[in-house]
Amino acid sequence: MQFNKPLRQGVLQKRYKRFLADIDFGDNETTTTHCPNTGAMTGCAEPGFTAWCSVSDNPKRKYSLTWELAQNNNGEMIVVNTQHANRMAGELLQTNLVPELSQWQELKPEQRYGKEKSRIDWWGVDQHNRECFIEVKSVTLADASQGYFPDAVSQRAHKHLNELMQVVADGHRAVQLYMVMHDGIERVSPAAHIDSQYAELCRKAASVGVEFYAVKCRASAKEIKLERPVPVSL
C-alpha cells in the first residue's frame, strides 16, 4: 500500500482526547491533527517521537492532517492509523504468504453476518467451498520483540471472539488475523496482563477451531508492505 501523496514529517508534542494529536512541523507553530486510533497507543505516542501525516484536500474537514506513522526512539516505525490494518489484510488475502488464507473463490470486505448483524472485516469462500469469516486486529503494543493485543480492556474484542466461536459452531471457518504494525514485534500473544478475559477467550476460541494468524508489515514514509508471518502464542 502506497501513500497517495508525500507525508509531512514532524515531531509529536502530545496526543489527547483520543482523536487529536499536536505535531510540530518546524514552522514555529504546533498543528492539531486527526488521530485515527481509539486505543491506548501505549509506546506509540510519546512526546518527541517523529510523526508522519497525510494531507487532505477536503475543505469540509476540520483537521486537514491525519497522523499516519510514528517512529520511536529505537528507530522503529509504527503504523498509527488502524484503518491500514484492514487494507493490508486485504492485500495479504490476495497473496500466498499465508497458504491457509489464499486461493479464494470469493472475497468481500465488511460483510454483515449473524443474528446481531455484526460486521466482519473480511468474508470469503475458500477453495474447499467453505465460508470463512476473518476478523482483523492491528497490533502495535510491544515489549521488546513481543507484541500484545489488546492495549486496553476491550469488550468489543471479547464480542468478536464470541461471534467467531459461533461461526465455527455454525459449520464455517473463523479466523482471528493480527496485522503487526510495529517494526520491533516478532511474535504476538493476547495481553493477559491487560485483559485477562480476552486471553481466556482466545484460548477457548482456539480450542473450538477458531484459527489464529499474525502477519508483520513494514512501514516507511512512502508505503506499507507485507513482510512475513510471525508466531502467535496463546
Curated annotation (Swiss-Prot):
Q: Which CDD domains match?
A: SfsA-like_bacterial
Q: Which InterPro entries match?
A: SfsA, SfsA_C, SfsA_N
* A GO MF label: DNA binding
Q: Which family does it belong to?
A: Belongs to the SfsA family.
Q: What is this protein called?
A: Sugar fermentation stimulation protein homolog
